[in-house]
């Protein structure tokens, strides 16, 4: 398992379900996909569900 999975990231913008945007993890911006069926708002804390390449798959906490 990737050591980043389970960590907390912060959404840098509003993300509708399955949308791609940015999230900050450990002070670094990452590409992020909302893996949830609900929207994520800018500034919302999210859990990293999985990592594919340089893309975080996040869900709201």
What are these regions (language model features)?
Residues 2-61:
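Terminal membrane-proximal soluble interaction domains of membrane-associated proteins
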């Amino acid at each position: 398992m990737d050591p980043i999975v389970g960590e907390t990231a912060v959404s840098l913008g509003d993300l509708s379900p399955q949308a791609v945007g940015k999230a900050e993890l450990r002070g670094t911006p990452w590409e992020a996909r909302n893996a949830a069926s609900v929207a994520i708002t800018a500034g919302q804390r999210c859990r990293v569900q999985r990592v594919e390449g340089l893309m975080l798959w996040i869900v709201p906490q």
